[in-house]
């Protein structure tokens, strides 16, 4: 395990180690990618946890097991050593992500955008997104200059999202501010 070469601003969290698996140093991983197995496409991970030094690790192998992944990391052969990685976020540099088609966005690109309704009222900023099964949901939290102090949950659908202007850092939505 080495120090990480990528800057912290360049790293995107794609999963989290949450437990150990077996006695040979494998770890259980919760993947934030869709499909979840895409996390295994990235062979070098930067691990980080608040209050700890970032570590760079190499993925040797991995497999899907039920609703989580099991990963084998290079040089990690002991269950107790693997347990020490529990709670670490798995990050990769954003430049490794595949390019998307026009009009498609990664969640990290949407986080922080100002959300403005059709009347020009600032509803807040996108804090994060949730996967609900039927559609993704944007968690919009109040910010300086927003209409009120309410947190809103807006569907990330064609009916709700009218336009996204990445250069301006804004998203126009069809949403009643009272809802």
Swiss-Prot record:
The lineage of its organism: Bacteria, Pseudomonadati, Pseudomonadota, Gammaproteobacteria, Pseudomonadales. It comes from the Bacteria. InterPro entries: PRC_barrel-like_sf, PRC_RimM, RimM, RimM_N, RimM_N_sf, Transl_B-barrel_sf. The PRC barrel domain binds ribosomal protein uS19. This is Ribosome maturation factor RimM. SUPFAM superfamilies: PRC-barrel domain, Translation proteins. It is found in: Cytoplasm. GO terms for biological process: ribosomal small subunit biogenesis; rRNA processing. HAMAP family: Ribosome_mat_RimM. The keyword Transcription regulation does not apply. The keyword Signal does not apply. Gene3D superfamilies: PRC-barrel domain, RimM. Keywords: Chaperone, Cytoplasm, Ribosome biogenesis, rRNA processing. An accessory protein needed during the final step in the assembly of 30S ribosomal subunit, possibly for assembly of the head region. Essential for efficient processing of 16S rRNA. May be needed both before and after RbfA during the maturation of 16S rRNA. It has affinity for free ribosomal 30S subunits but not for 70S ribosomes. GO terms for molecular function: ribosome binding. Binds ribosomal protein uS19. It holds the Pfam family RimM. Belongs to the RimM family. It comes from Pseudomonas savastanoi pv. phaseolicola (strain 1448A / Race 6) (Pseudomonas syringae pv. phaseolicola (strain 1448A / Race 6)).
């Amino acid at each position: 395990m080495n120090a990480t070469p990528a800057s912290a601003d360049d790293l995107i969290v794609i999963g989290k180690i949450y437990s150990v698996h077996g006695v040979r140093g494998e770890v259980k991983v919760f993947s934030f990618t869709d499909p979840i197995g895409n996390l295994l496409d990235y062979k070098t991970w930067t691990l980080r946890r608040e209050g700890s030094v970032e570590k760079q690790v190499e993925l040797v192998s991995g497999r899907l097991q039920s609703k989580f992944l099991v990963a084998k990391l290079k040089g990690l052969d002991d269950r107790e050593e693997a347990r020490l990685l529990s709670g670490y976020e798995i990050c990769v540099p954003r430049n490794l992500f595949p390019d998307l088609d026009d009009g498609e966005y990664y969640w990290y690109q949407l986080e922080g955008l100002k959300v403005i309704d059709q009347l020009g009222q600032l509803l807040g900023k996108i804090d994060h997104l949730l996967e609900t099964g039927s559609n993704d949901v944007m968690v919009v939290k109040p910010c300086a200059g927003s209409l009120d102090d309410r947190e809103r949950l807006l569907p990330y659908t064609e009916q709700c999202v009218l336009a996204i202007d990445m250069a301006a850092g804004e998203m126009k939505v069809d949403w009643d501010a009272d809802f």
